Amino acid sequence: MLRKVFYISDGTAITAEVFGHAVLSQFPVEFDALTIPFVETEAKAHDVKLQINDCFITTGERPLVFHSIVKAEIRDIIYSSEGLDYDFLNTFVAPLELQLGMKASPVVHRTHGKANEGYEARIDAINYTMDNDDGQTLKNIDKADLVLLGVSRCGKTPSSLYLSMQFGIKAANYPFVEDDMDNLKLPTALKENKSKLFGLTIDPVRLHEIRKSRMDNSRYSSLRQCRIEVKEVEMMYKRERIPFVNTTNHSVEEIATKILDVTGLERHMF
């Protein structure tokens, strides 16, 4: 039976999930996780406590409980359960109070509320990215913070969306397709915004596998075509001095981190 894990918060539980995932990923085992957001009342906290205790009775193992709860009275109820508590927020609050010389003033939903001053900026970035996905238009390319380039299915769209959703970056993307390969060059609008360009590449065999799952037995998905496109695009990156990274076997989070590291783009945290 898998070890039970609870992610609990009086907000969205995103912070507890991210922290918990980061810690548990260090161990080569699987876990049975349950996320419980918006534990905002003592009554709900008691319900959660019962779930944790029932899990302990059923399995004989104390559940791992990662939480980020602002209100002390609710937090204390979770503390009193049979779970093993890992309190992300309050582990660091007391030491920081000493260093900063002030008391914390906790507010529920401060980290993930719509009132957050960066909310509108993030929505604006997401809308921009969706409107400028896959080379739909180059009219507003000058408003981009970043333009991702690459062959079809190399990871441009998920990387663009992740950057806009997580960091408020206006990330357009532009594809190079089979018809471009005979005379591969940058469109004028991209040349005029060259400082914003960043390339993605991928192992041709991996690209072949991805395309096969979408359009099997086609020229588009053939290994030969994948090799041609990757080779031509990488040569163009080098010729135009466009920085690029290989996305093969990397998660969207890793790709985005590499892009931010190379470009120096500012991360807007919300």
Swiss-Prot record:
UniProt KW Cytoplasm keyword: no
Spell out the reaction equation it catalyses.
[pyruvate, water dikinase] + ADP = [pyruvate, water dikinase]-phosphate + AMP + H(+); [pyruvate, water dikinase]-phosphate + phosphate + H(+) = [pyruvate, water dikinase] + diphosphate
Give the InterPro entries listed for this entry.
Answer: Kinase-pyrophosphorylase, PSRP
A GO MF annotation of the entry reads: protein serine/threonine kinase activity
**Which residues take part in binding ADP?**
G150, V151, S152, R153, C154, G155, K156, T157
Q: What class of enzyme is it?
A: transferase
Q: Which superkingdom does the taxonomy of this entry point to?
A: Bacteria
Keywords attached to this Swiss-Prot or TrEMBL record, sorted alphabetically, are:
Kinase, Nucleotide-binding, Serine/threonine-protein kinase, Transferase
E.C. no: 2.7.11.33, 2.7.4.28
Cross-referenced NCBIfam families: PRK05339.1
- Family matches, as PANTHER family: PYRUVATE, PHOSPHATE DIKINASE REGULATORY PROTEIN 1, CHLOROPLASTIC
Q: Which family does it belong to?
A: Belongs to the pyruvate, phosphate/water dikinase regulatory protein family. PSRP subfamily.
Q: What does this protein do?
A: Bifunctional serine/threonine kinase and phosphorylase involved in the regulation of the phosphoenolpyruvate synthase (PEPS) by catalyzing its phosphorylation/dephosphorylation.
Q: What is the protein name given in its UniProt record?
A: Putative phosphoenolpyruvate synthase regulatory protein
